């Protein structure tokens, strides 16, 4: 087992413990508590996969964090400011668009829309989003464009459900790609979005989605939207 995998799990366990103590003092807001519950489920799953005890991992994670804090200056503890990256122009973001065969799905705090009438097109996904620590932090808006510039799909945050992770965004993109490819469209993702959401891609601009996810997502669009 990779040592970085183990130490990452240990630190995550300890930081979750700190956040839980914070929540126990009734100081956390609703999004904070929601993330706490989701992360607890994730840690349990990772612990089972790795064969590690969470309580033991938490103690080890505490030692790692304490060692890091002893070496850190106050200057190093400052949170870097997020960067705002734009694939789309203001006109592309604000343009109204219409669907001949509208399909819509809500996935967590993200709304996915697409036009099921679009077939046999080359489509590119563009997004405007913020980045921190060289990873996607917050999606502002994602849209799917044909080569002719027509908008045929969209992913946007729901104002009533604030807060999403980069994994939420990647899952939503998987749904959109699956739905568009169901109609024999060829979909690629902008280089900027690939870099900060996946940090890798295929040569044709596809993010590394496994084939079974593509089929699953396509069926989801077809049957549930």
From Swiss-Prot:
It is found in: Host nucleus; Host cytoplasm. SUPFAM superfamilies: Ns1 effector domain-like, S15/NS1 RNA-binding domain. Upon interferon induction, ISGylated via host HERC5; this results in the impairment of NS1 interaction with RNA targets due to its inability to form homodimers and to interact with host EIF2AK2/PKR. Residues 200-225 are annotated as: Disordered. Keywords: Eukaryotic host gene expression shutoff by virus, Host cytoplasm, Host gene expression shutoff by virus, Host mRNA suppression by virus, Host nucleus, Host-virus interaction, Inhibition of host innate immune response by virus, Inhibition of host interferon signaling pathway by virus, Inhibition of host PKR by virus, Inhibition of host pre-mRNA processing by virus, Inhibition of host RIG-I by virus, Inhibition of host RLR pathway by virus, Interferon antiviral system evasion, RNA-binding, Ubl conjugation, Viral immunoevasion. One of its GO terms (cellular component) is host cell nucleus. InterPro entries: NS1, NS1A, NS1A_effect_dom-like_sf, uS15_NS1_RNA-bd_sf. GO terms for biological process: symbiont-mediated suppression of host cytoplasmic pattern recognition receptor signaling pathway via inhibition of RIG-I activity; symbiont-mediated suppression of host gene expression; symbiont-mediated suppression of host mRNA processing; symbiont-mediated suppression of host PKR/eIFalpha signaling; symbiont-mediated suppression of host type I interferon-mediated signaling pathway. A motif (Nuclear export signal) lies at residues 132-141. Its main location: host cell. Residues 218-225 are annotated as: PABPN1-binding. A motif (Nuclear localization signal) lies at residues 34-38. One of its GO terms (molecular function) is RNA binding. Pfam families: Flu_NS1. Residues 1-73 are annotated as: RNA-binding and homodimerization. Homodimer. Interacts with host TRIM25 (via coiled coil); this interaction specifically inhibits TRIM25 multimerization and TRIM25-mediated RIGI CARD ubiquitination. Interacts with human EIF2AK2/PKR, CPSF4, IVNS1ABP and PABPN1. The dsRNA-binding region is required for suppression of RNA silencing. Belongs to the influenza A viruses NS1 family. Inhibits post-transcriptional processing of cellular pre-mRNA, by binding and inhibiting two cellular proteins that are required for the 3'-end processing of cellular pre-mRNAs: the 30 kDa cleavage and polyadenylation specificity factor/CPSF4 and the poly(A)-binding protein 2/PABPN1. In turn, unprocessed 3' end pre-mRNAs accumulate in the host nucleus and are no longer exported to the cytoplasm. Cellular protein synthesis is thereby shut off very early after virus infection. This is Non-structural protein 1. It comes from Influenza A virus (strain A/Chicken/Hong Kong/FY150/2001 H5N1 genotype D).
